[in-house]
Design a protein with these regions (language model features):
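Extracytoplasmic electrostatic interaction patches
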Residues: 91-151
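Short, solvent-exposed secondary-structure boundary motifs
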Residues: 46-49, 62-69, 89, 95-96, ...
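Short, non-transmembrane alpha-helical segments in secretory-pathway proteins
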Residues: 22-73, 77-81
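Sec-dependent signal peptide recognition
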Residues: 2-8
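Bacterial signal peptide processing site
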Residues: 18-20
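C-terminal motif of bacterial Sec signal peptides marking the signal peptidase cleavage site
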Residues: 14-16
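Amphipathic, interaction-prone secondary-structure segments
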Residues: 71-98
Length: 151
């Protein structure tokens, strides 16, 4: 019984410590850009795959969206076209519906944001890349899924 009580106390202490951590800040394009920068700093190997996105300045995905719709307001994106046949796209969002990962997001909503890094080949009309759940406190990827969309 004493052991059970100790385990319960430890769980409460952990929950209390985690409650003090701030939620991911996607209140502005600057905050979203900082989150993307933090991701690239924590994962420098990704910059070789998406070389232009580490310097990308994010903007609201739907600037005309009403402020009541926080899911849309908390989605930022940018794109870079290094040549006529290729486009790199970055998306940072707090909207789990956007990424189709509603269940996994419930476990990490206080700590993580969605990031999608995509490469669009205009000639092949093909979109590839990955989407991931990035923990802003531990600077760790919680989940990553590859994306491939072809005609």
């Amino acid at each position: 019984m004493k052991r059970f009580f100790c385990i319960v106390c430890v769980c409460f202490l952990l929950a209390a410590c985690q409650a003090d951590r701030p939620r991911p800040d996607l209140s502005s394009a600057q905050a979203a850009t900082q989150t993307l920068t933090d991701y690239f700093l924590a994962n420098p190997q990704v910059e070789k795959i998406f070389p232009y996105l580490s310097q990308c300045k994010l903007a609201p995905a739907a600037p005309q969206a009403p402020q009541q719709n926080q899911a849309v307001a908390a989605t930022y994106m940018c794109s870079v076209e290094p040549n006529d046949t290729q486009r790199y796209i970055a998306v940072v969002s707090a909207d789990p519906n956007l990424m189709g990962e509603v269940d996994i997001y419930k476990n990490h909503a206080k700590d993580a944001v969605y990031i999608a890094l995509l490469d669009y080949d205009k000639k092949a009309n093909r979109l590839t890349g990955f989407k991931l759940l990035f923990n802003i406190h531990t600077k760790r990827v919680e989940k990553q899924t590859e994306v491939t969309v072809e005609p």
